[in-house]
Swiss-Prot record:
Binding site residues for substrate: R36, Q37, A38, G39, R40, D85, Y160, S215, H338
Top-level taxon: Bacteria
GO BP terms in the entry: protoporphyrinogen IX biosynthetic process
EC number, UniProt record: 4.1.1.37
Name of the protein this chain belongs to: Uroporphyrinogen decarboxylase
Originating species: Corynebacterium glutamicum (strain R)
Gene name, Swiss-Prot/TrEMBL: hemE
The protein's annotated pathway: Porphyrin-containing compound metabolism; protoporphyrin-IX biosynthesis; coproporphyrinogen-III from 5-aminolevulinate: step 4/4
Keyword terms: Cytoplasm, Decarboxylase, Lyase, Porphyrin biosynthesis
Subunit structure: Homodimer.
Keyword Cytoplasm set for record: yes
């Protein structure tokens, strides 16, 4: 894989709380952004997406920029997260995939054999539609508002490819891992350049940070994660690390994997709501030393009302500070422990951001 270079045109941020926290500096306020902050919780999102498929919208520069910016305008979050989907790199590479309403990504042809792996297209270059959208986004963001890019981690993409779509148990995926490990490792290795080139495209266009998102890693044992997944996520984060921008690593239900995942090399570790932040920090620091924490409000608590919401936010902030004071963490970025739920009231998200910033 060719060496990556730092884009000469990358903008200079000034007092950007997300980036300061990610770099272990003291931010001007508690930084916050929410996974899936751009989406169905916003009426303006539903309006602009009407009649346009999810994947198509990810390849329309003006539309993806508008959707990315909507929550920044409305909620005063400290970062925009690029509106996209984890299967966008697959579609850009030429893989037949659609996002089916009510189900999720569905592949035209599952990958089940060594021949299937060898025939899987690789994303060789940049994604111009996404780069154009990023340019539009950066024109509106202030120099204190970060733009976070992202990509799906190789295990999650591999699971979609092997299962042919979403799976409750990932039985075909695990069967390939253990029953045909040679094919499994070949598939993971083949996904690496597609993911790296997707992130490279975003970085070339000017993103300020990135997140590697492993939706399904929580279904794995630590042993399986370490043997079958970690080497490939590590390779991706190492390649992106040459760009010298903050890297966030997050997986759902990964409390028992935090130590193993931290070995992949990100500066920031995302934590879901099932693990107290100070305990998560201990698990991470014991393996990889202190890192910046991201998280970890239960998305359902956005429905609870101001008083209980405030109590939970204060608890999470206190846990983060406990971890920092103990030398187990170097900073904290507030986020949910997963994505914003589609039926969340937009005004409740705005209120949560205000409480976090206060």
């Amino acid at each position: 894989m060719s060496a990556l270079t730092i884009p000469a045109a990358r903008r200079t941020l000034n007092n950007a709380p997300i980036i300061d926290a990610a770099n272990g500096k003291t931010p001007t306020r508690t930084p916050v952004w929410f996974m899936r902050q751009a989406g169905r919780s916003l009426p303006e999102y539903k309006k602009v997406r009407e009649g346009i498929s999810m994947l198509d919208s990810c390849f329309m520069p003006e539309l993806l920029a508008e959707i990315t910016l909507q929550p920044v305008r409305r909620h005063d979050v400290d970062a925009a997260i690029l509106f996209s989907d984890i299967v966008v790199p697959l579609r850009a590479a030429g893989v037949g995939v659609e996002i089916v309403a009510g189900r999720g990504p569905v592949l035209d042809a599952p990958v089940r054999s060594r021949e299937d792996v060898l025939n899987l297209p690789i994303l060789e270059g940049n994604v111009p539609e996404v780069e154009q959208g990023i340019g539009i986004i950066l024109d509106e963001l202030s120099d204190s508002q970060a733009l976070i890019g992202f990509a799906g981690a190789p295990f999650t993409l591999a699971s979609y490819l092997v299962e042919g779509g979403p799976s409750k148990n990932h039985e075909k995926t695990k069967a390939m891992m253990h029953g045909d490990p040679e094919t499994w490792h070949a598939l993971m290795a083949r996904l690496v350049p597609t993911i790296v080139n997707s992130l490279k495209s975003q970085i070339d266009a000017g993103i300020d940070a990135m997140q590697l998102f492993d939706s399904w890693a929580g279904f794995l044992t630590e042993r399986d994660y370490t043997e079958f997944v970690l080497p490939y996520s590590t390779e991706i984060l190492e390649e992106v690390g040459k760009y010298q921008l903050p890297r966030i690593h997050f997986g759902v239900g990964t409390g028992e994997l935090l130590g193993a995942m931290s070995k992949a090399g990100s500066e920031v570790m995302g934590v879901d709501w099932r693990v107290p932040l100070d305990k998560a920090a201990e698990r991470i620091a014991a393996v990889s030393g202190p890192k910046v924490l991201q998280g970890n409000l239960d998305p359902a608590l956005l429905f609870a009302g101001r008083a209980p919401l405030t109590k939970e936010i204060e608890r999470i902030k206190a846990e983060a500070q406990t971890a920092i004071d103990a030398g187990h963490a170097t900073g904290h970025i507030f986020n949910l422990g997963h994505g914003v739920l589609p039926n969340t009231v937009a005004e409740d998200i705005t209120e949560a951001v205000s409480i976090i910033h206060s």
